[in-house]
């Protein structure tokens, strides 16, 4: 696996957060790149919420909303209206889209200690997410 690029995100209060904060723990991270206008994301995110509820003790979950055709406010409204409780961030400077070469959303990564172990492009189910993090 290749190493994760360093980047900054904004949380939904528009505060900047450095990527190191996510990946340095001993837990693996499910890193999902999404957009609130994306129908496949609408399909996947309920599964991500369920996965988060069931696994948050052993897996970090991070969902990043991209800034293409979107705004922090749009993303925040979408998350609030769906009552999602997983940690959410905003790719304000496109560093995620560029750094991970994201061609489409949803884009799912399994990251452990800053190394990318698995990538899955397209919609994932709860079963698929559980399989990705079996070990």
Name the predicted role of every residue range.
Residues 33-50:
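Conserved redox-active cysteine motifs that mediate thiol-disulfide chemistry
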Residues 26-29, 34-37, 104:
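Short pre-active-site segment immediately N-terminal to redox-active cysteine/selenocysteine motifs
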Residues 8-29:
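A short beta-strand-turn-helix
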Residues 77-84, 92-134:
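Thiol/disulfide oxidoreductase modules built on the thioredoxin-like
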Residues 35-40, 67-70, 94-96, 123:
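Solvent-exposed loop/turn segments at secondary-structure junctions
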Residues 54-92, 105:
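Conserved segment of the thioredoxin-like fold in thiol-based oxidoreductases
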Residues 30-31, 61, 108:
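Hydrophobic beta-strand anchors of alpha/beta hydrolase catalytic cores
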Residues 33-35, 64-66, 113:
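Cofactor-binding loop segments of dinucleotide-utilizing enzymes, especially the Rossmann-like FAD-
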């Amino acid at each position: 696996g290749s190493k994760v690029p360093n980047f900054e995100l904004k949380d939904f209060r528009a505060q900047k957060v450095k990527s190191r904060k996510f990946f340095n723990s001993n837990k693996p991270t499910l890193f999902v790149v999404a957009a609130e206008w994306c129908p496949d994301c609408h399909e996947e995110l309920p599964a991500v919420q369920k996965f988060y509820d069931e696994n948050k003790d052993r897996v970090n979950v991070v969902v990043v909303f991209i800034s293409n055709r979107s705004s922090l406010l749009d993303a925040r409204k979408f998350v609030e209206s769906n009552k999602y409780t997983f940690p959410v961030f905003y790719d304000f400077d496109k560093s995620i889209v560029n750094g991970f070469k994201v061609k489409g959303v949803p884009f799912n990564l399994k990251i452990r200690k800053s190394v990318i172990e698995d990538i899955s492009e397209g919609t994932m189910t709860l079963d698929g997410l559980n399989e990705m993090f079996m070990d």
